[in-house]
Amino acid sequence: MVTIVYQGSKNRLAKYIIPILNKLIKENNCEVFIDACCGGANVIANTKYQIVCNKKYGFDNNKYLIALFDKIKFNDLDYIHIDENEYKKVKQDFLSGNNTYEDWYYGYVGFLFSYGGLFWGVYARGTDAKGNPRNMGRERYNNLLNQKEALKTATLTIENIFNINLDDLDKLKKNNNMLIYIDPPYKNTKQYNKEKFDTEKFWNLVREMSKKCIVVVSEYEAPKDFIPIWEKEIVQNINKRLDTNTQLEKLFVIKDYWWKYD
């Protein structure tokens, strides 16, 4: 199945990750769940495995992705086929900063019709790596449409994780516990934009957040003051020839955690 593919998508691992998050939510009476780098919303708005929490918020710094989700949530969006010429035209307009189109349309073209889930990478052609016919854009549209009801259960907001105000988190959770799940760009991998992700700054932020909230991070590795509570070996395609490599995906938490986890 092809979801709305966002580089680093957690759809394949959702059936493992979400039960762990739900267990933490239940054991610690969390009233608020935040997916701080929600990407394709495959955790916060999964169609098969639901995050069970009273209030759910998803943050992502790509405004075109959030606009696309809002378009699906609040409007009827019919399928629009995008051929390679249209893709190149919209991509060039985007790169030129002309703002000819609405934000949701940049998201629609840039995510649903890009190869490998890289926003404005290259056009996803109508065949897979073995030459079999495949309409990637249509498949992604159908799966995005299937997420519509799940997306309605969460509030999705444009937010850079480094701009999250810890005092605002206090106001949001009030006197209750909060679980923050973070799936950051992996260290030493291609980024979504030209800005390099500041890994050191990120882990310092997680340390501060962990003083007030339950924070769970999806990563391959973490600093020594963090420990894994779950891990699974995954196989990834790394190019169009279907070459693969193997990684050990882990869920990390601060070593000296204060909350319940049996």
Segments predicted by a language model, with ranges:
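Long, positively charged, glycine-interspersed low-complexity recognition regions
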Residues: 194-262
